[in-house]
């Protein structure tokens, strides 16, 4: 049987929020089968729990935010991406502020935390959402068109194409394909950092965004070049970060997908719109388990390898 997974022990990290600039502590704790991933605002007089789901997403401005009533947790996508990449199903995330820490701007630190705590099997079947028909959302037209699509696939494959019209980005790979059956999330995707442009920083900070951003947790570019002295971690780091974000956004569904995801110029908003369209299209998917692990897609039966 393909089983659900959680952590063997708890693990802890301290950092700042990318957009809020606030100091924040997170503690990742094991959770029972069928719990899902639950964020807990432990800084409030009464702890508020927010279970991840596509409909819990309340805002997608520059990040994915989940909410329960007026209580929110911002920028959950990098931690969610690490959970997706390492196939962690059940987890409590205790958090002391309203934004997940950005750490180094990628999912690598979250991968390290999860693997350091240890990932263990649980005595419950892992439930997948398997696509049976194609679901697609689009916005805009012509050169400004954005789209994202989920199609039937025996496994989990993601392909993404970017178009930023910037010399530093244009000099790198514009499209990447990642397949869970043949690639290593920790090695191939997790280290890709978020990125931004100096010309946007003043505007973002006027809106209360990017207050914790800098060269130590993002790739920063002026009009012509990358400002980080160390350069890129991957030749195609920009588009790989979009894959990283998409994996996190899609894992907010609450169950792992068996599908081919493909997108052009998509972001947090369109990814969530795609999930909501998927939920609306009840004819386009089914929930499946694998009693025989041999029948499961490659890449899901074993625990994810370390670095």
Swiss-Prot record:
Pathway(s) where this gene product acts: Glycolipid biosynthesis; lipid IV(A) biosynthesis; lipid IV(A) from (3R)-3-hydroxytetradecanoyl-[acyl-carrier-protein] and UDP-N-acetyl-alpha-D-glucosamine: step 2/6
One Pfam family in the UniProt entry: LpxC
GO BP annotations, alphabetical order: lipid A biosynthetic process
Active site, per annotation: 268
EC number: 3.5.1.108
UniProt GO molecular function: metal ion binding; UDP-3-O-acyl-N-acetylglucosamine deacetylase activity
Binding, Zn(2+): 78, 241, 245
Example of a GO cellular component annotation carried by this entry: membrane
Catalytic activity: a UDP-3-O-[(3R)-3-hydroxyacyl]-N-acetyl-alpha-D-glucosamine + H2O = a UDP-3-O-[(3R)-3-hydroxyacyl]-alpha-D-glucosamine + acetate
This protein's UniProt keywords: Hydrolase, Lipid A biosynthesis, Lipid biosynthesis, Lipid metabolism, Metal-binding, Zinc
Enzyme class: hydrolase
Cofactor needs: Zn(2+)
HAMAP family with a match to the protein in the record: LpxC
Job of this protein: Catalyzes the hydrolysis of UDP-3-O-myristoyl-N-acetylglucosamine to form UDP-3-O-myristoylglucosamine and acetate, the committed step in lipid A biosynthesis.
Similarity field: Belongs to the LpxC family.
Protein name as it appears in the record: UDP-3-O-acyl-N-acetylglucosamine deacetylase
Organism lineage: Bacteria, Pseudomonadati, Pseudomonadota, Betaproteobacteria, Burkholderiales
